[in-house]
Amino acid sequence: MEVDHADRDGARRRCREYLLALEEERRKIQVFQRELPLCFDLVTQTIEGMRSQMDAAGSEETVSDQGPPPVLEEFIPLKPSLSLSSSEEESTHADAAKSGKKEEAETSERHSSPPPPPPEAKKVTPDWLQSVQLWSQEEPQQPSSPSPTPTKDLPCKPVALNARKAGGAFQPFEKEKRAELPASSTTAAASSTVVGDSGDKPTDDDTEKHMETDKDNDKDAKDKDKEGQSQPHRKPRRCWAPELHRRFLQALQQLGGSHVATPKQIRELMKVDGLTNDEVKSHLQKYRLHTRRPSSTGQSSAAAGVPAPPAPQFVVVGSIWVPPPEYAAAAAAQQHVQLAAAGNNASGSANPVYAPVAMLPAGLQPHSHRKQHQQQQQGQRHSGSEGRRSGDAGDGSSSSPAVSSSSQTTSA
């Protein structure tokens, strides 16, 4: 008995150490519970099984310490009664033997087989395992006998997998493009993607070509639709007629010139239906570029009533800075002549442009005129010298008769 108790104590101590080691491992795995869910469940089930075995062993020890269970004695009559026959006695003895054998078998199975795990050992699978089903819960049942009614196969859409594209069991979602294709193309695509046992397998290049052609057709159709929608919204370009330009000039004159007026003010004064600020702005910019020349500035200032700018203080003549009091007067006279001519020709042209004519002062002459003047002076000098010579000769001839006459008078 002492040896049995020592063995039991040693086995209990080893089981307790093993249980402590398992709990330590479970604490280590609990840190990585999301990465190792199956390991955590296995260790937990093992710990629960060891605890149940230890509890069962402790209950058996307490029963063995108390002593053997009481045996219920069967009271068998020593003398058979007269009412029981020999066959009934044999059947009762056989039943008693069978019941005894059943009890012995149950006790042997109880000691040999481990106790069933408690209901706490059954853990619920985690949420992330429930969301993605990695196993099949129902085993496929093979029909023992063929069913008399044939099952109707559901229409399945053929799927063509591309081996070049990355990705395993999870394929990216793509919209179906079969609805946009005509009937002939859908049938051709279906026949190329469906793979039979005896037919050839379609290549990935064919499927890619089909998809590229479909995309090109879709893009062309979308571009045509956009062009058809954008064309009716285009506004025709504004054509500035002479009457419209005349109103534009009148508005500028009322507002004080092109550099003061704004497109909004011009449009309000013109009072033309359909005329926008952008159109007036573009026309005003063109008008400013057109009238940026020196003569045009003088004309616009005179038309708007603004005094003309003062005359320049120096004028370059032959690479020499000369103060031009006479040039300023000549330029002002020429400008007045041009303005008068512009007023006379206003009815003929809407916006005439005149270029100023440079005039030299009275005392200054160009180089060619200087040469001509010098030549004329030389010619005059030459003619003057010849006249003097002829005059001297005439004086000599006239003096000689006088001398002769005087000599004649003296001689007489």
From Swiss-Prot:
Residues 90-112, 198-228, 383-392 have a biased composition (Basic and acidic residues). GO terms for molecular function: DNA-binding transcription factor activity; sequence-specific DNA binding. Its main location: nucleus. Transmembrane segments: none annotated. Residues 232-292 form the HTH myb-type domain. It holds the Pfam family Myb_DNA-binding. The keyword Transcription regulation applies. Induction: Induced by nitrate. Residues 54-241, 286-310, 358-412 are annotated as: Disordered. Keywords: DNA-binding, Nucleus, Transcription, Transcription regulation. One of its GO terms (cellular component) is nucleus. PROSITE patterns: HTH_MYB (PS51294). InterPro entries: Homeodomain-like_sf (IPR009057), HRS1-like (IPR044787), Myb_dom (IPR017930), Myb_dom_plants (IPR006447), SANT/Myb (IPR001005). Residues 183-193, 395-412 have a biased composition (Low complexity). It is found in: Nucleus. It comes from the Eukaryota. One of its GO terms (biological process) is negative regulation of DNA-templated transcription. Residues 263-288 bind DNA. Transcriptional repressor that may play a role in response to nitrogen. May be involved in a time-dependent signaling for transcriptional regulation of nitrate-responsive genes. Binds specifically to the DNA sequence motif 5'-GAATC-3' or 5'-GAATATTC-3'. Represses the activity of its own promoter trough binding to these motifs. NCBIfam families: myb_SHAQKYF. This is Transcription factor NIGT1.
